[in-house]
């Protein structure tokens, strides 16, 4: 019987990780390197490139690390040119870059909206356009994984353009899965919910951050965990494990779909496990209401 590593068939492949030096992207890079994948990564945070590159090299992998802003077309093109020059194959692409700052749509400037679209959808199109010829050149097929969000699948007040851009990425991914199926190039999205990270904290409105500053870290964590059925937020490694699956031959017949790595929040659809015995309901009941308002 073959081992799971043999069935995954990742050893010796090459991956490009867009936004691969910090946060979730770093976890993805290290997970792939740990599975025997040579990695090419770019990141706007140039100071994070060296430690991530060094850590991956210590695992015995070949590493290309490039400082680049993926939302700048010329920098993304230069990165892929470097990938093609360094490696004779490309098997896996992971588009991690994304992000937003919470704001009501009517308060956002056209420039802010355009930035949200480019950061969460526009560069993904360009990345796929650059990656496909390199994958085709190898003739082995490949896997492209685009990070999205639960907000691509529900209304998200305060994140209108972000949610719309991620939804566009989702349907673009589905469509390209159909177009590229004949090349055995699989495309899927990975949709997390809230993940503890510097980027997610920066996305919060300043006034909300100010209010939260007076609340204990334990209380903040409890409030974040309350609406997740598994009662915990994911680690970046949890998301990286989802990437490993989609990148590997274990998912050889999986394409055009979304893997929700969210602890069950998509399934819960707004039902929250309220405290004080109210259990799973979309609104608080007597146990919580009495403690909030009967004073």
Task: Locate predicted features.
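C-terminal substrate-recognition "lid" of short-chain dehydrogenase/reductases
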Residues: 125, 230-261, 266
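Residue(s) in the substrate-gating loop at a strand-loop-helix junction
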Residues: 149
């Amino acid at each position: 019987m073959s081992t799971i590593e043999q069935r995954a068939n990742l050893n010796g492949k090459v991956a490009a990780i867009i936004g691969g030096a910090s946060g979730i992207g770093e976890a993805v890079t290290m997970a792939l390197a740990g599975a025997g994948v040579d990695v090419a990564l770019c990141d706007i945070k140039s100071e994070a490139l060296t430690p991530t590159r060094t850590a991956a090299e210590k695992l015995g992998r070949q590493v290309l690390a490039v400082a680049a802003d993926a939302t700048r077309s010329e920098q993304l093109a230069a990165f892929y040119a470097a990938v093609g020059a360094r490696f004779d194959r490309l098997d896996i692409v992971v588009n991690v870059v994304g992000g937003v700052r919470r704001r009501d749509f009517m308060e956002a400037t056209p420039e802010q909206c355009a930035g949200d679209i480019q950061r969460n959808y526009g560069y993904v199109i360009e990345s796929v356009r650059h990656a496909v010829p390199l994958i085709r050149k190898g003739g082995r097929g490949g896997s492209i994984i685009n990070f999205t969000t639960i907000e691509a699948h529900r209304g998200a007040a305060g994140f209108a353009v972000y949610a719309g851009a991620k939804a566009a990425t989702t349907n673009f991914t589905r469509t390209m899965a159909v177009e590229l199926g004949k090349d055995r190039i699989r495309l899927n999205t990975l949709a997390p919910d809230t993940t503890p990270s510097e980027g997610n904290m920066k996305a919060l409105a300043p006034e909300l951050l100010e209010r939260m500053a007076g609340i204990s870290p334990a209380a903040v964590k409890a409030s974040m965990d309350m609406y997740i059925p598994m009662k915990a937020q994911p680690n970046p490694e949890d998301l990286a494990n989802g990437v490993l699956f989609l990148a590997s031959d274990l998912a050889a017949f999986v394409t055009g779909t979304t893997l929700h790595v969210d602890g069950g929040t998509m399934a819960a659809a707004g039902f929250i496990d309220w405290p004080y015995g109210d259990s799973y309901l979309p609104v608080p009941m007597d146990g919580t209401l009495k403690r909030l308002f009967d004073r």
